[in-house]
Amino acid sequence: MRGRMKTLSEIKEILRKHKKELKENYKVKSIAIFGSYARGEQKETSDIDIMVEFYETPDYLKFFELEDYLENILNIKVDLITKNSI
């Protein structure tokens, strides 16, 4: 799954390019990156921590489909949480 380690700017650009799909297919209202990538401390082995807020709360299947979708477009292991879970 891993390629060259992406910068935070590259990750944000990828997410921007997929904004329409994220909103239409997964009802994503907002996305925030936190953890090592947000602090600029990521390593080759780091996953990316993403917090998502939804327009409509998804069922578990749709939530994990979103996590898989993000991993595929970013080519990085994603640790996904919801805004309501913190």
From Swiss-Prot:
Keywords for the protein's UniProt record, in alphabetical order: ATP-binding, Magnesium, Metal-binding, Nucleotide-binding, Nucleotidyltransferase, Toxin-antitoxin system, Transferase
Motif placement: GSX(10)DXD motif: 35-49
Residues binding Mg(2+) 1: 47, 49, 79
Pfam families per record: NTP_transf_2 (PF01909)
Annotated InterPro entries: NT_sf, Polymerase_NTP_transf_dom, Type-VII_TA_antitoxin
Entry superkingdom: Archaea
Known catalytic reactions: L-tyrosyl-[protein] + ATP = O-(5'-adenylyl)-L-tyrosyl-[protein] + diphosphate; O-(5'-adenylyl)-L-tyrosyl-[protein] + ATP = O-[5'-(adenylyl-(5'->3')-adenylyl)]-L-tyrosyl-[protein] + diphosphate
GO molecular function terms noted in the UniProt entry: ATP binding; metal ion binding; nucleotidyltransferase activity
Cofactor note: Binds 2 Mg(2+) ions.
Residues binding Mg(2+) 2, per UniProt: 47, 49
Oligomer status and interactors: Probably forms a complex with cognate toxin MJ1216.
Main function: Probable antitoxin component of a putative type VII toxin-antitoxin (TA) system. Neutralizes cognate toxic MJ1216 by di-AMPylation.
PANTHER family listed in its UniProt record: PROTEIN ADENYLYLTRANSFERASE MJ0128-RELATED, SSL8005 PROTEIN
Name this protein carries in UniProt: Putative protein adenylyltransferase MJ1215
Taxonomic lineage from the root: Archaea, Methanobacteriati, Methanobacteriota, Methanomada group, Methanococci
